[in-house]
Swiss-Prot record:
<feature type="signal peptide">
    <location>
        <begin position="1"/>
        <end position="18"/>
    </location>
</feature>
<dbReference type="InterPro" id="IPR023605">
    <property type="entry name" value="Lipoprotein_NlpI"/>
</dbReference>
<keyword id="KW-0564">Palmitate</keyword>
<dbReference type="GO" id="GO:0051301">
    <property type="term" value="P:cell division"/>
</dbReference>
<keyword id="KW-0132">Cell division</keyword>
<feature type="lipid moiety-binding region" description="N-palmitoyl cysteine">
    <location>
        <position position="19"/>
    </location>
</feature>
<protein>
    <recommendedName>
        <fullName>Lipoprotein NlpI</fullName>
    </recommendedName>
</protein>
<dbReference type="GO" id="GO:0005886">
    <property type="term" value="C:plasma membrane"/>
</dbReference>
<comment type="subunit">
    <text>Homodimer.</text>
</comment>
<keyword id="KW-0802">TPR repeat</keyword>
<keyword id="KW-0732">Signal</keyword>
<keyword id="KW-1003">Cell membrane</keyword>
<feature type="lipid moiety-binding region" description="S-diacylglycerol cysteine">
    <location>
        <position position="19"/>
    </location>
</feature>
<comment type="function">
    <text>May be involved in cell division. May play a role in bacterial septation or regulation of cell wall degradation during cell division.</text>
</comment>
<feature type="repeat" description="TPR 2">
    <location>
        <begin position="96"/>
        <end position="129"/>
    </location>
</feature>
<dbReference type="InterPro" id="IPR011990">
    <property type="entry name" value="TPR-like_helical_dom_sf"/>
</dbReference>
<dbReference type="InterPro" id="IPR019734">
    <property type="entry name" value="TPR_rpt"/>
</dbReference>
Amino acid sequence: MKPFLRWCFVATALTLAGCSNSAWRKSEVLAVPLQPTLQQEVILARMEQILASRALTDDERAQLLYERGVLYDSLGLRALARNDFSQALAIRPDMPEVFNYLGIYLTQAGNFDAAYEAFDSVLELDPTYNYAHLNRGIALYYGGRDKLAQDDLLAFYQDDPNDPYRSLWLYLVEQKLNEKQAKEALKARFEKSDKEQWGWNIVEFYLGDISEATLMERLKADATDNTSLAEHLSETNFYLGKYYLSLGDLDSATALFKLAVANNVHNFVEHRYALLELSLLGQDQDDLAESDQQ
């Protein structure tokens, strides 16, 4: 190719790439990242005052530490949450909800064997604690134990077939086992559902029934305020990231996982595992390493 023609080709390619990136940014739906509320700050201050009091029984102290840990977790303060959960467990080692949170943190840190043990403890203490099946299933999924993950996530799905996110996680696992059968099973679950929750729109996208543009238009139309918009975006961007990851489009997947995290919906499963996905993609997660790998 002659130098002049080569230059024209490169210039045209750069121009088209710039237009494509610009169009992507203009069409992107964004929310204001969630921030701590005054009510949450007041509750934390009040909890601190009560915990400083000596007029608490052991059971009361353990419960309050757990509740403060949950609040810390919802604000993204995982190191403080883990500290409260550990203190609660030292006082009362029979709290399944505490083992559940610790198992989630261990999964996020990639410490899967310890996570399995934590979720096993949850179900030993309370066999009806169904979310342990979700969280253990996710840990097994990331740990590469796909058949066991399918068993847990199928049990979780069967408890509420109208919850779209149960179908989505089950599909992500079954996709690794047999992609064609997984798609057929997802379609069957979609058709049997009441389709009332927002997440079924994501399922429709996965099935190829709607485009990504239609999905995002429905998202904007469904959101009633900034909080619901941020929550829907955290969910949708995570599952879009998983979709593009399955296609081998690592750049789009990485961008979408970052967008899922950017909304600060810290207590959503999609936010938690978008961080893990970024870690697996080689993105630096210094806070994750420092707080969880102990």
